[in-house]
Amino acid sequence: MLKRALLLSLVVLLVVPVVVRAQPSAAPETVGMSKERLALIGQALNGQIEAKSFPGAVVLVARKGRIAYFESFGQLDPKTGSPMTKDAIFRLYSMTKPFTSVAAMMLVEDGKLRLGDPVGMYLPQLAKLEVAVQGTDANGKPTYTVVAAERPVTVYDLLRHTSGLVYGGFTRNEYVKDLYAKNNVGWAGVTPSEQLDALAKAPLARQPGTAWEYSLSTDVVGRVLESVSGVPLGRFLDDRLFRPLGMSDTTFHLPADKVKRLAQPLATDRATGKPIVLHDVTVAPKNDAGGAGAAGSTADYGRFVQMLANGGQLDGKRLLAATTVRHMTSDHLGDIKPAIPLLAPGYGFGLGFAVRRADGLNGLPGSAGEYNWGGAAGTGFWIDPKEQLVAVLMTQAQPGAWQREFRDLFRQLVYQAIID
């Protein structure tokens, strides 16, 4: 009888879904924010929806560890007209990168990885790389000479995007851009080995450690993590990050029972009229792309960023040391200059995040030490330790620089709602 009871109890535990504990909420005024001023966020986002920037959005603002504002606007799917819901799931694109960067620092804390390690220690394909050095001819036209890399690319280079790797669509090194296109160097539709083999065939755009260039570096960090841990990146993140934080909706492959919660973009771009096509997270990927492949909900991401804001812990569970979080969110560029104009004025870059260097030097509000990142389809977050503030914005929109319009508006309205 006892055995039967124990068996039934086990079955119940396996069948009943785990209830994720939500972050605590608070009346805005109790955490130094104005309810009336926060309401301006909704007015502004509804204006963006009417202007066809995106069909819907979910936003979360927390201060002093408690949620002051968590709202949804517009439509989840413009084809069906279904309303946006707070539990909607979004393609995160580059907001995947902070997950992978945090996971790398977990292995550093475990003593299984060092930032100064050459990447070739873990990925032999990338042990001996070349560099396409740019020059100019007598007519001022660019020339390229392929030479050996002066030193190996390190894990540190990957995390701060000084590896010499690029994104083919961003780089100004035309020689490397052409080879990336020819050899299908990217993050989607390739296996891990295919990705690494393609990267090995293309030279770096710059000598390692000499310039900041946003790139596939974080995807390579994911391959390093797989080599060290012996498991796919998605499984490692599930075990060490997502499950411990209760991030039950964050994944590289959205299961069938959650597809109805996936937010969809407008059919066409408002500026060009061309169809908007986003990454399909409902199909099992050939690789867990640590730089762009995840999807997740606003509440999930809110828990992740609150963990960072708390110095590496949430709900009594410590995932990182506070010293590690401070190290990751410090500027690691110094005098190293960006090769492409992607970092906002007044920002450097840490180990996975853009980092604000001063209260000023930028037309938008923020504090020195604030750190942030975003995703191509209209997602973004920032953490301001000085203000004890975290903010998450989720939309699904046409990728492009034009998104700064609504991203900047959201930031401005969050800061104007602080009243203490």
Regions found by a protein language model. Name each.
Residues 398-420:
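Generic C-terminus detector
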Residues 8-17:
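Bacterial N-terminal signal peptides
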Residues 77, 124-368:
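Short, surface-exposed loop or secondary-structure junction motifs
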Residues 1-8:
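Bacterial N-terminal signal peptides that target proteins for export
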Residues 39-46, 59, 65, 90-122, ...:
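Active-site SXXK
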Residues 29-92, 112-114, 128-137, 277, ...:
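Short, conserved catalytic-motif segment at the N-terminal edge
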Residues 380-382, 388-397:
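Short, well-ordered beta-strand elements
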Residues 20-24:
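Boundary at the C-terminal end of the N-terminal hydrophobic targeting segment
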